[in-house]
């Protein structure tokens, strides 16, 4: 009986090893592998870099009105693309359960390939009507023109599907991507990104 237990234990260890080294290893990436880096800390750093780029644009331009539009890619999609691309790389396949400087750079590059920030300024001359009292109880309307500078910041993003096209993913890689992004994995994504275990 003891022999069977050993076989079962070995099989379980092998299965866990296979899972961790597959695209699903991303769901184990919340732990520090000894270098102080986790998926959460790297995502926070990239988010900070993203916010800094937005602030940079605001600080570099003199403006009266700020108009922001668009949205960035959902982190779950960025990480799914990273996981498939990294584990199935023909030249240098790597597991994604751990994080290091090299993988951090890969993830950062994918994030910026999926997210683009563009900006422009435009001067507009607008008519402003001000109402004043003439001192005798009469309202006097005065029209003046003002030139105001508008700063437009647009964030555009690519979906996981668009990145699969860009990277030339084959059918098997697209299937992996689809499985990672399935709704039943949402609680696993929450755990990876926020350390939150749901349900």
Q: What is the predicted function of each stretch?
A:
Residues 1-198:
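Membrane-proximal envelope biogenesis segments
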């Amino acid at each position: 009986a003891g022999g069977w237990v050993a076989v079962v234990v070995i099989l379980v260890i092998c299965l866990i090893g296979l899972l961790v080294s597959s695209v699903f290893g991303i769901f184990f990436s919340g732990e520090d592998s000894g270098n102080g880096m986790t998926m959460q800390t790297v995502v926070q750093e990239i988010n900070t870099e993203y916010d800094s780029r937005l602030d940079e644009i605001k600080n570099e331009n003199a403006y009266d009105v700020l108009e922001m539009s668009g949205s960035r890619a959902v982190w779950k999609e960025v990480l799914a693309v990273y996981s498939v691309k990294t584990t199935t790389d023909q030249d240098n396949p790597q597991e994604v359960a751990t994080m290091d400087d090299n993988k951090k750079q890969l993830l950062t590059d994918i994030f910026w390939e999926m997210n683009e920030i563009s900006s422009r300024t435009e001067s507009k001359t607008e008519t402003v009507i001000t109402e004043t009292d003439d001192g005798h109880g009469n309202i006097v309307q005065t029209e003046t023109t003002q030139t105001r500078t508008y700063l437009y910041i647009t964030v555009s993003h690519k979906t996981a599907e668009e990145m699969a096209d860009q990277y030339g993913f084959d059918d098997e890689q697209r299937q992996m991507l689809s499985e990672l992004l399935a709704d039943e994995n949402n609680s696993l994504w929450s755990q990876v990104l926020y350390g939150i275990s749901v349900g």
